Design a protein with these regions (language model features):
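Class I SAM-dependent methyltransferase SAM/SAH-binding core
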Residues: 47-49, 53-104
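A short SAM/SAH-binding and catalytic strip from SAM-dependent methyltransferases
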Residues: 113-126
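A short acidic, Gly/Pro-enriched loop at the edge of an enzyme's catalytic core
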Residues: 103-114
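Conserved class I S-adenosyl-L-methionine
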Residues: 1-39, 55-59, 82, 157-167
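Helix-to-beta-strand junctions that scaffold the AdoMet/dcAdoMet cofactor pocket
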Residues: 65, 123-124, 137-138
């Protein structure tokens, strides 16, 4: 079974439970934080990659208003079914759901922002996907990645063991590599790609150090794009906040 097929099967089977967890009060606050990182204005166009059941839609729609546009992209039918139900219940005419591969999103033109929450860890190599997301941004556009990982705080050693067990339990498919290690490697690679593509980035951790939120802004002039600045330069100048 391919990684894509395994992911579709897993999340399609657990869509109802996923939606319940994704909208739990504590998790909801994480999603608000991610939406705020995009600094959306009324009328903006924002695309969510791997939108799942649409748990982020209310926060994105609230910020772009009725004159803006929200597009959710996901590959799993079960997830999208619940996302469409959420849109229909709310009566949002400017929120759209598209079944497509988030690594190759069918975007017709530049957008103001791209959001991906707990998504890049599913990609064997997230670099091409992240690069395409940044390329889809208009000058000055923002991208935000929210992901979970082991905490580096001193008290977290026993909790990290529980975290690794949780990741193994919820990982679609089974492989020889530790799911927790694979997740960490993929998330780090995705963050490095954002830093290499965006002149300005900000990173913060919260949730006892288990959650990391990276925000990147595409350059407004001809200097935007690959190679400006290098990943090393971006990391050196990146403001880092912890909570």
């Amino acid at each position: 079974m391919s990684d894509v097929t395994a992911t579709q099967s897993f999340y399609g089977r657990w869509a109802r439970l996923y939606d319940w967890v994704a909208t739990a009060p504590g998790v909801e606050s994480w999603r608000v934080r991610a939406a705020e990182a995009l600094a959306l204005d009324p009328g903006d166009a924002v695309v969510e990659m791997g939108c799942g059941t649409g748990a982020n839609f209310p926060h994105l729609r609230e910020r772009v208003g009725p004159e803006g546009t929200v597009v959710g992209v996901d590959l799993t039918r079960g997830m999208l079914r619940r996302a469409r139900e959420r849109v229909e219940r709310a009566g949002w005419e400017n929120v759209h759901v598209v079944q497509a591969d988030a690594t190759r999103p069918p975007l017709p033109g530049p957008v103001d922002a791209v959001l991906a929450t707990f998504v890049v860890g599913m990609f064997a190599d997230p670099r091409p996907a992240v690069r395409s997301w940044v390329d889809a941004l208009a000058p000055g556009g923002r991208v935000a990645l929210l992901n979970a990982g082991r905490s580096e705080r001193r008290f977290a050693t026993p909790l990290n063991l529980a975290f690794r067990g949780f990741v193994r339990a919820v990982a679609p498919g089974k492989g020889s590599v530790s799911p927790a290690r694979a997740l960490e490697r993929r998330v780090a690679t995705a963050r490095d790609e954002v830093r290499s593509q965006c002149p300005t980035t900000e990173f913060e951790t919260f949730g006892l150090g288990y959650l990391g939120l990276l925000r990147g802004e595409r350059g407004a002039g001809p200097e935007s794009g690959p190679g400006h600045p290098t990943a090393t330069d971006a990391v050196a100048t990146e403001p880092t906040r912890t909570q």
